[in-house]
Amino acid sequence: MRIDVLTLFPEMFSIFNHSIIGRAIEKEILKINTVNIRDYTIDKHKKVDDYPYGGGAGMVMSVQPIVDSIKAVKKENKGKVIFLGPKGKTFNQNLAKELAKEEELIFLCGHYEGIDERAYEYIDMEISLGDFVLTGGEMACIPIVDSICRLVDGVLGSSESYEDESFYNGLLEYPQYTRPAIYEGKSVPEVLLSGHHENIKKWRKAKSLIITDKVRPDLFKKYKLTEEDKKILKDFNKKL
């Protein structure tokens, strides 16, 4: 997958040179480029923003450098142009799965009080991270790109690495434990030490269902319980 990020602060994306995403870039599974929007302004002072027509607080990103940077990137990247903004669809795991199927994507990070409305003609999709205010689009772009990239084939060791994670199947993840088996009198659940893979699988599914119901009832309501799920919960509750 190729991703180009249009931003005023390209240095913020150096985080992708590390850990799982960094290794995927080294293996050429991913290619993440940053493009400085400021490089495309025709203003002699390198300005990329101006006062809003009609008055108001703050500054607005100018249409010219935004559009010219999009056009330049589009010569090599034919993917959707995604703007990180408050009017967009709220990002979630399902949207991450859909975007992970794309071969190319372009992200546009806004700043200041927003972008000139005329730039929207060059934008295919707007995504919001949530109902809260951030300093700039970069803050939203980083977790969104990370979430998408980890679902690209080959980025993680195996599909099991992300299929068991919270949200992937509509549920929160089960509890995790590592050594020591006993710490300050608190023991790891016996089933996890048993080596019985089927029982471990059922325990994890039961805990995942119970935790989701308790912590995120909104997610649990959307989840469709199978007959196997119901049996796992029934058997789990009998052992309590």
Curated annotation (Swiss-Prot):
This is tRNA (guanine-N(1)-)-methyltransferase. Its EC number is 2.1.1.228. The lineage of its organism: Bacteria, Bacillati, Bacillota, Clostridia, Eubacteriales. The keyword Methyltransferase applies. Gene3D superfamilies: 3.40.1280.10, tRNA(m1g37)methyltransferase, domain 2. GO terms for biological process: tRNA N1-guanine methylation. It comes from the Bacteria. It catalyses: guanosine(37) in tRNA + S-adenosyl-L-methionine = N(1)-methylguanosine(37) in tRNA + S-adenosyl-L-homocysteine + H(+). One of its GO terms (cellular component) is cytosol. Specifically methylates guanosine-37 in various tRNAs. Homodimer. It is found in: Cytoplasm. S-adenosyl-L-methionine binds at G110, L129, G130, D131, F132, V133, L134. GO terms for molecular function: tRNA (guanine(37)-N1)-methyltransferase activity. Keywords: Cytoplasm, Methyltransferase, S-adenosyl-L-methionine, Transferase, tRNA processing. Belongs to the RNA methyltransferase TrmD family. Pfam families: tRNA_m1G_MT (PF01746). It comes from Clostridium botulinum (strain Hall / ATCC 3502 / NCTC 13319 / Type A). NCBIfam families: PRK00026.1 (NF000648), trmD (TIGR00088). Transmembrane segments: none annotated.
